[in-house]
Design a protein with these regions (language model features):
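Short, surface-exposed "cap/lid" segments of acyl-processing enzymes
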Residues: 45-47, 51-80
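Accessory cap/linker subdomain of secreted extracellular hydrolases
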Residues: 159-229
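Catalytic active-site module of serine/aspartate enzymes centered on a nucleophile-bearing elbow/loop
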Residues: 276, 282-320
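Short beta-strand/loop motif that positions the catalytic acidic residue
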Residues: 235, 241-243
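N-terminal cap/lid segment of alpha/beta-hydrolase-fold proteins
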Residues: 19-45
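Conserved alpha/beta-hydrolase
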Residues: 73-100
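Primarily recognizes the serine-hydrolase "nucleophile elbow" in alpha/beta-hydrolase
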Residues: 123-178
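Alpha/beta-hydrolase active-site loop
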Residues: 106-127
């Protein structure tokens, strides 16, 4: 019995050691202030790959949470990667969470600033001897930021999660169609046209201020200038497009549009996965509930597919 116990301990010991994780809170100095992040680092004697996780639109923090939902999607992804021996850094964007002081007024936000911040994080990670390579993983609007940053600062791999394949103004028009009365729909199309042309507009109908309030218009102008598929095509790194089949915000056709822009990219459709990376039925009520269920596990197939992709490109954990 004693010998059996010793053998069992010997078998699980390397596994237990590989699961030792360090949590750190790095700070990145940029020209106008500081960005704050969370580094999840499997303990290792050798350099290991690190993934930079880039959150989606609006006031979404490093963990994937915003005022509309607390689901810890990116925190859960970081934990899943760590179990496979992949380090990760996720960060609060300027104007969000601990990085609020960088842009307390949303008028100061722009896609260009987000991309510069991501590129600066990449450079910091690439200069850290603890890491062998940098992987970019962008979720939702973060997929666009990741694509643009990858073209600016070369990385070992680019992964998009639920990223749009069309200009965001086109997506917005589609989402508003059928949801607004004719007069408001016409006003929204006019506002989108103005912003697409680079012009702010006041006044804004009260019912549309949540989308087109004057303070967010400068950011929308910078966003509407972007073409996600074109940005993705210009990134040279090996690329993986991941899309859930039960995502109610971004459709499979968006993923296919990204792949059409770059046929060498891999496409992985995760059956039943929604926008916050959970396996959830397509019914709206259950979908909405999952946006506030931080304890619900993320899709197992998600981390499995990421690891398969990384392994195929020689990006392996230190324990491999």
């Amino acid at each position: 019995m004693r010998l059996l116990l010793i053998l069992l301990l010997a078998m699980i010991s390397p596994f237990a050691q590989s699961m030792t994780l360090l949590n750190q809170t790095p700070v990145l100095e940029v020209l106008d202030g500081r960005l704050h992040g969370s580094l999840l680092l499997p303990k290792s004697d050798r350099p290991l790959p690190v993934a930079l996780l880039i959150a989606g639109s609006g006031p979404t923090d490093r963990n994937g949470n915003n005022p509309m939902g607390h689901n810890d999607s990116l925190k859960r992804l970081a934990q899943g990667l760590a179990k496979q021996g992949i380090a990760s850094l996720r960060y609060d964007k300027r104007g969000v969470g601990e990085s609020l002081a960088l842009a307390p007024d949303e008028r100061d936000l722009s896609v260009e600033a987000y991309v510069a911040d991501a590129a600066a994080w990449i450079e910091k990670l690439q200069g850290d001897p603890r890491f062998s390579s940098v992987i970019l993983i962008g979720h939702s609007e973060g997929a666009l930021i990741a694509s643009l940053a990858a073209a600016r600062q070369p990385v070992a791999a680019l992964i998009t999660l639920a990223g749009s394949g069309r200009p965001i103004d086109d997506v917005l028009r589609e989402q508003l169609q059928g949801r607004l009365p004719p007069a408001l729909l016409a006003s929204s199309h006019y506002l989108i046209d103005e912003l697409r042309a680079g012009r702010t507009h006041q006044p804004v109908p009260e019912a549309l201020k949540v989308l087109f309030r004057p303070s967010v218009q400068p950011y929308l102008i910078s966003l509407f200038r972007q073409d996600p598929a074109q940005a993705f095509a210009q990134a040279d790194a090996p690329a993986l497009i991941i899309q859930g089949t039960h995502d109610m915000q971004v459709g499979i056709e968006d993923a296919r549009a990204l792949q059409r822009s770059r046929p060498d990219a891999e496409l992985a459709l995760i059956s039943g996965m929604n926008h916050v990376l959970r396996i959830v039925p397509a019914q709206p009520q259950q979908q909405l509930a999952s946006y506030n269920e931080p304890d619900r596990p993320i899709a197992r197939a998600l981390t499995e597919r990421i690891m398969k992709f990384l392994d195929s490109h020689g990006i392996t954990p230190a324990s491999s």
